[in-house]
Amino acid sequence: LQRQRTVFPLPYYDRDTPLKIEADFWKHDYLFTKENCYTLLFDKEEDMDMVGDTTLTSVQVEWIFLKTRMVKRYYFERKRGMWMLEAINLREMEKGENEDFVEFYTRFVRDSVYQSKHISHPLQFITIDPDDEFSILETTLDVDQWYAFRPVMPTDRLSNINYGQKNEDLSDTKILKVNGIGNGYSNIFYFRKRGKGWELYKYEDTSI
């Protein structure tokens, strides 16, 4: 099925080197389907409404590799009702291209001391009411409570599906949405840039 949904020879850009992948040399790419979860990046809350827009004809799927600062982007176009993979681009993250936030996030998830200094006091916390699963509970957490509640966050790479939402380099807010694959996991992390740099100011856990 994947070969049928791929345009061959497939343009593949390895940094500055343009290549072509013939159908006979294509290896099945699982993207993030073998992962436990995938992530999405947004600048604004309203942009999250773009997910699932059935009118879209173009979507890019990205892997952002935190250690190497590499970005692998898959370009999909919808033609005659079918999504087709039209190109893949592997390149270094450009200066300013979410680089500031990615640099912060990489340290935030790996350095607990740094993390504690970049959490809003108090931290807004939204979750499902344990006494009523149909109600949302809005409360706050202090740093110690955050460490008790915090989930495992991706540390090696982030995925992103670009539905047309803006990911501006100069945006002073970023939203990281982590969706589980077939397990009901759903966490959203809200970051903003203040005088001391980026901070986590809201955490939402609506996992089922």
What does each model-found stretch correspond to?
Residues 62-96, 184-208:
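Short beta-strand edge/turn micro-motifs at domain boundaries
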Residues 79-117, 122-137:
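Surface-exposed beta-loop interaction hotspot
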Residues 8-70, 133-185:
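Surface-exposed, charged secondary-structure patches
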Residues 12-14, 124-135, 195-200:
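Hydrophobic, well-ordered secondary-structure segments
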Residues 11, 73-74, 113, 124, ...:
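Intrinsically disordered, low-complexity N-terminal regions enriched in serine/proline/glycine
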Residues 36, 40-42, 115-118, 156, ...:
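Generic marker of "main functional regions" within proteins
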